Each structure stands twice: as C-alpha cells, then as structure tokens.
Amino acid sequence: MKVATSALLVGAVSASVGPQQQVLKFPDSFSELKEGAWSKPLHKLEESLKTLTGEARAVWDEVAMMFPESFEKAAFFSEPKPHTRKHDSEWDHIIKGADIQNVWVENKNGDKEREIDGKLENYSMRTKKVDPSVLGVDKVKQYSGYLDDEEEDKHLFYWFFESRNDPKNDPVVLWLNGGPGCSSLTGLFMELGPASITKDGKIKHNPYSWNSNASVIFLDQPVNVGYSYSSGQVSNTVAAGKDIYALLTLFFKQFPEYAEQSFHISGESYAGHYIPVFASEILSHKKRNINLQSVLIGNGLTDGLTQYEYYRPMACGEGGWPAVLDESQCKAMDNAYPRCASLIENCYNSESVWSCVPASIYCNNAMIGPYQRTGQNVYDIRKPCGSNSLCYDELDWIQAYLNKKEVMKAVGAEISSYESCNFDINRNFLLQGDWMKPFHRIVPGLLAEIPVLIYAGDADYICNWLGNKAWTEALEWPGQKDYNKAEMEDFKIDGKGEAVGQVKSSGNFTFLKIHAGGHMVPYDQPEASLTMLNRWLAGDFWA
C-alpha cells in the first residue's frame, strides 16, 4: 500500500546485514540486470564492519551518533509465518515451470530453441477457482492461488478478477502495493478492487473498480507479505523480480485466453522501485508469453536524490496546501537537505549497503521526521493521522475480514493469520540498502520500449507530486528535452466539467497530477483514477 513510516523512522539495524560490497550495478541493457551479489549469504555486522573503508566507517558512525535509536541491534529476519500447505488435490489447476522449459520449437533458421525464456524449473503455480457467490466480492470469474518456488520454499499469493466488461479483449493489469512489505489486498479492498470492507465487515460494491474494463491480478509480494509465506526472505527488489516473471509466465500459460491481450504493470509507493525492475526483467526475455505494453506508477519512490529535496517545500506550503511546519522547522529542513543529498549521492555512486543505509536513516529522520512528529497524516496532508499506526482505520477492517476462516478457505490461503503490512520486511529492505538505490536509471531503458505513466495525488506528503514531477523532468533520456517542453494541460473526466488533474506527455513518458488525491489516488479520487486507467490503457496519452 504505502511507504511504512514507522519503519522509516526506526530503521533498527540488526546483528547481520549485507556485506559492504553487495553492489547492484544498473544496466545498459535489460539482460545485464542480475540478482548478482544479493544472493550471497549475509555476514554478521561485526565481521562486515572490518571491511569498511575509513570514509564509509566515518559516515556510518556519524549517522549512528545522530540517531542511536535507529541503530539498535535487533533480529534481522522475522520468524516464518505458521502455515499449512494444502494437498494438491484441493487445487483446480497445477502447472509446473519444468514442463514449460521442456517445450522446444524450431526458429526461422531451423534451430531448436525453448519456446519461453527464463529459469522456471523450480517454480510451479497452484490455482483455485473462487466461487463468486461465497464471498460476494464480485460476480466475475475469479482465480486465486500460489506461485511456489520449491527450491527456496517461497509461496506468493495472487487473486485474479476478470474484467466486468469484455474479458476476451480487455487488457490485463497487475497491481502491486508498496511498503515494502504491504499486502496488495489492501489495494483490492481499499482502493481499486471490486469491493471495499465496511467497519462491520460487510462487502461494499465499488462501481469504480479497475476491473470495470480490465482484468486485474492482485499479488502479495515479496514473500511473507499478506497471504504469501516462506521459510526464507527476500530483502531487495531485484531478487523479487525473478518471482514476478515466473508467476506471469505460468499464469498466462495456464490461462492462454488472457495471454493475447495487452498486459500492464501498475502500483504505488515503493512500487516505484519494484515496477522498473519487474518490467525490465520481463523485457529482458525475448521469448516470452507476457504481452507487456506499459507501466503505471502512482505516488512512487523512484529517485530519492531528486524526490527528497521536495519534502521541505511540500511541508512548508509550496505544494498547493497550507504549511504543516513553522518557519523554524522549515529552515531546519533546508539546513539538513545538503547533508542528505550528499549521502544519497554516495549511495548512488557506490550502491553499497554501507553508503545506502546511512543515507536512508539520516534522510528519513531529517526530511520526514519533522512532519510526522506533528501528527499529520503523511499520506494526506489535509488530515491528521488516525488511531491506526498507518493512519487509516480501514486497514484494521480489511485485516479482520481477511483473517476470517471462511474467507481464507474460499481463496485457498495457507497461512494462519493475515496482516496488512509486515514491518520486518520494510526494515530488511532498508537495511540491505535497497531504499535509496537509483532505480530511476532503469526507466530510460523502459521508455525505449514501452510507455511509462507517473501519476501522483497532489495531497500526498510521503511520495509527493512535487518530487515525482521533478524526477521525471530530471531524468536523462533521449526524449528529455521534448518532455520538459511539454505543457501541463487540464485532465477532465470524459473531457467535460472541471479539471480533476493536470497532465503532460511526450513520447512514451507521461506525468499526471490528480487534484485532491492523497498517497492512494483510487481511494481519494475513485472516478478520476478509473478515468486515468481507461484512457491510459486506450493509448490516449501515447498512441
């Protein structure tokens, strides 16, 4: 769902984190994007500290002295979720990646080659046909189940809803919430899915669901998020990308009736990290059955160096809403940003855990902390934060609903309990240096092949529209000059009435600001968000 600020401001460093030189180099081509060093065993902190350069140790010690509470030692990995795996006979479909990899075809040169690229032999997918009448979430055809990686004991939960309109021809959309560590079932029941959950646990129909004109897959990832589970962990974005490619490959192989339609990846918040990597992973496979046509990122975190500069303006009345902080607090943030920027630049240059973790902890405390301490909602600058730690009571209602035995049985969930956000995962990603890595560097490669939409509700603080617009304009790509010349134009529902936002577009790149929308645009502006989706999928901005 969102960037979890409680983990942002705590960031408790554990007794074991990644070694200093676990470096993720960003690719000149999709095929160069590899998991690489991230698959290596984690070292103990005490051992890894011995490898630090003097400069890196000085930075680490400096930030640790500033925020000692953020460097308390704690268990790095959470305990695995209790679960009970269902017998294969309880599933309607099971497809194995090894069977797909054994399919060979003859190419135009007469040579034999695999029909589909990728390392799939360790994966399988189990599917259950969900009876729409049992839960009443929607009347459309639904499937749920797990992608299994048997070698690493990873099990990712998904829930598919067919389009309400014309499923044989309508696009297919994958939705990803952020966190990292927040369930995409939050997006299903709070934002863009077929129904929401009321305070008393009832189902409420959503007329603006994104499956109005598209089939939608909601995926709980990485492992140990939502209904997903594993005895191991995924603590960086690139590692998670391999699972997404496998899931989609197996899904479209099992259900070829959806494979010919256009496919799009969408998400919000930390999905600003996920989506560039996941899309590039898909595009790196030239022989694939995934018809990826575009990506959509809402209120995302993609380029920290550019985006963190805009926390002070947003908090101090320059983002279109009244100031939350007073003059002295704003001045303190002005003074803090140069150090923050320097730390992020070090992270960008080295992509090292020992540079990126201090950057995350310093910048989050200095640039987000002053705002959060006011009690104002970081996801909506117009409101105070509610009683829930993530500011929305609806999360408690959704969590209670998804913990009902009859709900878990209906969708085939195998874990003992559901939680909306797993803060251990949030911390793990931060402590692997993933938070501040320059994922925007992947975007030019995407733009060379597919359209990219960056949209933002204008009332969000945590991933605000100022920063999102700024990074799209700062991005170096062949179309940068023309994109920056493009004017912001009114965005209207059906082209009529008052503007619900402003949009600029050039080539394959589009930025859209939604008026009076917070971090979760479909929650605050459901009609505008559906209009945005439908027009985007129709190619209005990039055809």
Swiss-Prot record:
Q: Which InterPro entries match?
A: AB_hydrolase_fold, Peptidase_S10, Propeptide_carboxypepY, Ser_caboxypep_ser_AS
Keyword Protease attributed: yes
Q: Where does the source fall among the domains of life?
A: Eukaryota
Which of this chain's residues carry glycans?
Answer: 122, 213, 508
- Matching PROSITE patterns, A to Z? CARBOXYPEPT_SER_SER
Q: Where is the active site?
A: 269, 460, 519
Q: Where is the signal peptide?
A: 1-17
The EC number on file is: 3.4.16.5
Q: Which residues lie in the propeptide?
A: 18-128
What Gene Ontology molecular function terms does this protein carry? serine-type carboxypeptidase activity
Which keywords label this protein? Carboxypeptidase, Disulfide bond, Glycoprotein, Hydrolase, Protease, Signal, Vacuole, Zymogen
Q: List the subcellular locations.
A: Vacuole
UniProt xrefs under Pfam families? Carbpep_Y_N, Peptidase_S10
Q: Which GO terms describe its cellular component?
A: fungal-type vacuole
- What does it do? Vacuolar carboxypeptidase involved in degradation of small peptides. Digests preferentially peptides containing an aliphatic or hydrophobic residue in P1' position, as well as methionine, leucine or phenylalanine in P1 position of ester substrate.
Name used for this protein in its record: Carboxypeptidase Y homolog A
Q: Which organism is it from?
A: Leptosphaeria maculans (strain JN3 / isolate v23.1.3 / race Av1-4-5-6-7-8)
**What gene does this protein come from?**
CPYA
